[in-house]
């Protein structure tokens, strides 16, 4: 049995068309949803500056903070992870009197002053390194998510020293 070149080309085009349709349907079916190992939210972190306005009613700390590296991730299974390296006061490169931090996750609108959740507190090492890993309860819907890294005091989380975002 021999297949003409015309029939072979037609068969290959049909297979390609069916494959494209299957892949597009599969991609469309998961739009707006995330696979088990995906991420719902991820961002870099930036230190605060004196010009920062309150975010969700939380004031920035009284002095600027910088960091070498910072990331935050939230998975669809509720796994929250925040890492900071070198989160220190801009003026002197130390953590000053700050020894503990927490991370608050907020959703819009900005007038919402109650976080969806707060993770931590965890120790902030003298070199400004810290890591928070927690399983959290996810909000059912979240628009414009923002994470604030906050000074943890005896009364709970206070001012923010870093937030989700970037600098150029």
Which residues fall in each region the model found?
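Sec/Tat signal peptide C-region and signal peptidase I cleavage site
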Residues: 23-29
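Helix-rich interaction surfaces within compact, conserved domain-sized segments
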Residues: 112-168
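Short coil-to-beta strand junction motifs in C2/discoidin
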Residues: 94-102
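Transition segment at domain starts
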Residues: 31-76
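Bacterial N-terminal signal peptides
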Residues: 12-22
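Short amphipathic, basic-aromatic surface patches that mediate peripheral association
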Residues: 86-94
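Bacterial N-terminal signal peptides that target proteins for export
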Residues: 2-12
């Amino acid at each position: 049995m021999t297949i003409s070149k015309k029939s072979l080309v037609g068969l290959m085009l049909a297979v390609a068309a069916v494959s494209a349709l299957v892949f597009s349907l599969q991609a469309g079916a998961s739009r707006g949803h995330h696979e088990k190992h995906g991420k719902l939210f991820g961002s870099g972190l930036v230190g605060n500056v004196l010009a920062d306005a309150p975010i969700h009613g939380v004031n920035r700390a009284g002095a600027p903070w910088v960091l070498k590296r910072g990331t935050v991730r939230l998975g669809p299974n509720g796994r929250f992870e925040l890492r900071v390296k070198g989160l220190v006061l801009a003026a002197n490169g130390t953590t000053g009197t700050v020894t503990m931090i927490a991370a608050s996750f907020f959703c819009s609108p900005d007038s919402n002053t109650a976080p969806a959740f707060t993770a931590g507190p965890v120790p902030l090492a003298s070199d400004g390194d810290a890591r928070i890993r927690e399983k959290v309860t996810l909000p059912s819907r979240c628009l414009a998510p923002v994470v604030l890294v906050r000074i943890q005091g005896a009364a709970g989380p206070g001012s923010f020293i870093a937030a989700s975002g970037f600098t150029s």
